[in-house]
Amino acid sequence: MSEYSMPSYFQTMPVIGKELVSFNEDNAAEIQQVEQEIHEIREAALEAGRSTESLNESGQWTAMQRITELVDEGTWCPLNSLYNPEDNKNGSVGIVKGLGRIDGKWAVIIASDNKKLAGAWVPGQADSLLRGSDTAKRLRIPLVYVLNCSGVKLDEQEKVYPNRRGGGTPFYRNSELNQMGVPVIVGIYGTNPAGGGYHSISPTILIAHEDANMAVGGAGIVGGMSPKGHVDKEAAEALIQAQKNLKSDIPGTVAIHYGETGFFREVYADEEGVLAGIRKYIDMLPAYDPEFFRVDDPKEPLFDANDLYSIVPFNQKRSYDMVEVMARLFDGSEFMEYKHGYGPEMITGLAKIDGLLVGVVANYQGMLMNYPEYKMATYGQAMGVGGKLYRQGLIKMNEFVTLCARDRIPMLWIQDTTGIDVGNDAERAELLGLGQSLIYSIQSSKLPMMEITLRKGTAAAHYVLGGPQGNDNNAFSIGTATTEIYVMHGETAAAAMYARRLVKEEKAGEDLQPTIDKMNALIQDYAKKSSPKFCAKAGLTDEIVDMNDMRPYIQAFVNACYQNPESICPFHQMLLPRVIRDYDNLNQH
């Protein structure tokens, strides 16, 4: 199809980028070495626990085998695969999660990892579940559980069961999604007592394997009710007998919840049947044909995504051309820039992903002569630095977010930032207020947003540039092998913490070396805790992806945004493309 609205705006976007003159093999090798380390950690986490062979021999599939059968080939985008904030021994929080298409419709898919403690709730899992439901909420796409959950890991219940974002919170979130009209569909396998039972019952549609069960309490709980407050031999023997009796009367089987309560909508005899049942109900859900929202035919970028291994420097002190990165991400390497030349530290504008509009904000990299204007006015000269935020850039981003919100265009942020400008010049230029203004603009936009921390995410700039802190907007964030996230550079932090002590010790004639050692230890700690591996493990970003895999994640995000949007702006009623054209025309004269 090639008949689209307003072709003079959307099918004549300027082409950006150019072919590489040479490829930096050394830079690529450094990036790929980190990527390989991430791959190995991810694979080890997936394989930890009971062997795949053992599960298959018992008639069960693994979480990944179930996901592979359920999801359309080539569409799986893992999220939080390295997330393990509580250092669980198996390297994960006991679920496998991501975005994927099911019979052409995007969904958030969360599968219990039945290789580990029969899919038990472990520390960190509740927060990861909430991140998944947040993504479904932001994108207004179905949430699909492939459930096989044995309940709370009881010897760590205090880290799993209670708290504001604890074991019960996802059940409230499922109710919230249902009330928003966002369905939650679950395929239930195995034994699901207590926390697993509520996890089973809280979705919209329940589909079960014939051997599945769900219950308020499992056999162990039912048999272990004792008022004594301790266990003696008599109690132990009674527990043994109760367990023997309960094996023939397991709580919450298909006979109860299909045959009597009717909670199970459908029951299947095999693994494939449950997944086919999920697909059946996904097929019933409303979704726009993406052609409805397209402004152009889908195209691949003009340039190879593998070029990114050469373009993006592994050395954080080296600069590069952000436009060349963008040229490897967007359809046809086309980009309609908003207010080129104003606020030059920020690149803002419209791009296309699979023919669908997306608003883009990215940090320019490199030096900026005679900028910012507030320093020029004071000193008669100035040198701005790409990656830092100044007055004009903050104003421009506020305007751009507001126009994207008005035109209902989802947004992509590409961060490589050292923070917002500091000092009294910056204070007089109102940067503190303008940074918070951008947060206000984002919060009021009600837009779904995706954020990529390409290299540095630093200081308050990491918040204001569409970061994951914007919980009502940010659907998910990703990083790369070059990602670093910290409040400030380690050397800066060491100076901030110890400068006064050095002055005091020097004045007193004391040995400075112990303080110097502490400063260097802090610098090393910052380096460790800002690495891609740590960022993923701690959840500072939702996934570390390969350089050449950024576009598939952007495609998943943009297509999901247009699947079932809450509101629409007709193309011929949009303001942003017209503002871009008029600004460009005015500045040509």
What are these model-derived regions, one by one?
Residues 2-589:
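Ligand-binding clefts of soluble mixed alpha/beta catalytic domains
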